[in-house]
Amino acid sequence: MLTWLQRDSFQFPPLAKAMREPNGLLAAGGDLSAERLISAYRHGCFPWFQDGQPILWWSPDPRTVLFPQELHISRSLAKLLRQQRYRVTFDQDFAAVIAACAAPRAYADGTWITRGMQEAYRQLHQRGIAHSVEVWQGEQLVGGLYGLAIGQLFFGESMFSRADNASKVGFATLVGKLQEWGFVLIDCQMPTQHLHSFGARAIPRATFADYLQRHLNLPSRADWLA
């Protein structure tokens, strides 16, 4: 039975209570306050819903993750990185990145990054928890992604690309930095062929929860504005 969250409580049900079908649906309701979002990610779940739906919280089993040291870079991407066709920055224009991620796409109906979702993550960015990666071609923003950094874990949310392989350049650059900064795991949430091409793989939800317990409260060496 689906758990409905109360607005005055930031607690989530145990991950083991998530539904098998649809895979990982854990709870519904609540709000998108910064406190609840932080509680959700620390618990191992994330919001994902369409505009007009109640807020839905998910914790799929298995969980798709990328260990930074397992990053796979194709020959074509390695060549592109060497060419330095694009310039990559961090936390320079979070609002523009999340707005671009929310923009309509030809292969999808609607967007799950609603206006309320954008505002919620902008607040997390102001708190130094949500971060953006920008990919520039000259002075034009042509790609990027955003996510949350808590302890030694990075929770990826969404990416976009307006130029060939721009988001791939941004993601590969981010993973390299995360490894340098001592991050141990990148949460990719759901499997995609794009992520698997980088070396992402599925692990049991219980294993993912163990990483949360062991690494969420450990410091990293992150310097997002360096």
From Swiss-Prot:
Main location: cytoplasm
Example of a GO MF term: leucyl-tRNA--protein transferase activity
Primary enzyme class: transferase
Keywords tagged on the record: Acyltransferase, Cytoplasm, Transferase
InterPro entries: Acyl_CoA_acyltransferase, Leu/Phe-tRNA_Trfase, Leu/Phe-tRNA_Trfase_C, Leu/Phe-tRNA_Trfase_N
GO cellular component assignments: cytoplasm
Statement: the UniProt record of this protein carries the keyword Aminoacyl-tRNA synthetase: no
EC number(s) per entry: 2.3.2.6
Reaction catalyzed: N-terminal L-lysyl-[protein] + L-leucyl-tRNA(Leu) = N-terminal L-leucyl-L-lysyl-[protein] + tRNA(Leu) + H(+); N-terminal L-arginyl-[protein] + L-leucyl-tRNA(Leu) = N-terminal L-leucyl-L-arginyl-[protein] + tRNA(Leu) + H(+); L-phenylalanyl-tRNA(Phe) + an N-terminal L-alpha-aminoacyl-[protein] = an N-terminal L-phenylalanyl-L-alpha-aminoacyl-[protein] + tRNA(Phe)
Record carries keyword Kinase: no
Superkingdom assignment: Bacteria
Location in the cell: Cytoplasm
GO biological process: protein catabolic process
Function summary: Functions in the N-end rule pathway of protein degradation where it conjugates Leu, Phe and, less efficiently, Met from aminoacyl-tRNAs to the N-termini of proteins containing an N-terminal arginine or lysine.
HAMAP family: Leu_Phe_trans
Similarity annotation: Belongs to the L/F-transferase family.
Protein name per the record: Leucyl/phenylalanyl-tRNA--protein transferase
Gene giving rise to this polypeptide: aat
